[in-house]
Amino acid sequence: MMNRGISVDDCLPKFFKVYLPDDSGDDLELPISFNSFLPKSLPKNVIVRSIYGNIWKVAFRKFCGDSERFVMVNGWKKIVKDEDLKGGEFLEFEFDGSWCFNFCIYGRATCKRLRSSVQITVLDDNDDGFNDDQDYGEEVKSSENFIVLDDDDISDVQDYNEEDTSSEDITALDDADNDDINDVQDYVEEDTSSEDIIVIDDDDDDDDQDYGDDDHADVEKERWRGVKTEKKKKGSSGEHDRQYLDNHMNPFFTVNQHRQIKYNMLRIPTKVITKYGLHFPEFINLIDPLEKNFGKLKRKVKGQTIKGFRSIIRRNNVKLNDKVICELEKEMDGLVREIKVHVIRG
């Protein structure tokens, strides 16, 4: 059964399944009628988010080479166990159009199941990517079926599934990642910073400045130079990027990913601030490309320089050859209350 259901912000496609224990195997097959809503470039893995707090990553495959049948594998049994599914319950899956299915359960009386306490399953984040031709019959090389989400992502899921009592659709984030610990620690350890800070940089030398002594600095710098050279060949800088803005009159700048990934900072060039006479309130909304799922990320402006930006880079699975553009929503007096993030795939 498939239905184009109504989401909070937009119409998103849904499909429904009846859970029958005797007929349910190791995998979950999607209705063929739902194929028209799947992206042309199929993800190797998809995220299933339960409204009750659990998060799973499952493999997404063609069923035994059949181009019209798709299944979720390597994780469906875990979902059944974690949610304690009962025979005859209705399962609703809402697809965001790219890689995420929001999941809820209706009892036999067609009432949505609620849970008093939220349970968060922390999973591991690797093996992302796209594959059009990999079939269900192929051997799955990774023994890990789950992903690890950082504190920002888990906070987003919780806030998305809880009733919003504020007048604005704003999600307050947890503390930003600690730059001095490794990626695994970033994902699973409690953050020690006191607040989420946006830092507006007053340094224009964004592309070439090196920071600190790093054993891998030369390698990283050389790799980043290669990415920049390729972008220049494609003519992907300057006013050419204005075509990606929602409002072509807004100020914008292209993010230096080398700095964002390594130093977890969003740096706004002084020349942009000066040229347009920009200034900022105490709090600013950072609008993620996945806004329909996560809402606006509310962050505090402190001093002259925005921190904790790496979570958006991770959440959107941004690669070095992708382009990240920040569009500044400017009011008549130059006040910027919102920054829209656009991810352009390379």
Curated annotation (Swiss-Prot):
Compartment(s) = Nucleus
Is-annotated flag, keyword Thylakoid? Answer: no
Q: Which UniProt keywords apply?
A: DNA-binding, Nucleus, Transcription, Transcription regulation
MF annotations from Gene Ontology: DNA binding
Q: Which domain of life is it from?
A: Eukaryota
Which ranges does the entry annotate as DNA-binding region? 13-109
Q: Does the keyword Nucleus apply?
A: yes
Residue stretches of biased makeup (Acidic residues):
192-217
Q: Which GO terms describe its cellular component?
A: nucleus
Gene3D superfamilies the record matches: DNA-binding pseudobarrel domain
According to the UniProt record, where is the region Disordered? Answer: 158-179, 192-243
List, as start-end ranges, the regions of compositional bias called Basic and acidic residues.
218-229
- This chain belongs to which protein, by name? B3 domain-containing protein At5g60142
**Source organism per UniProt:** Arabidopsis thaliana (Mouse-ear cress)
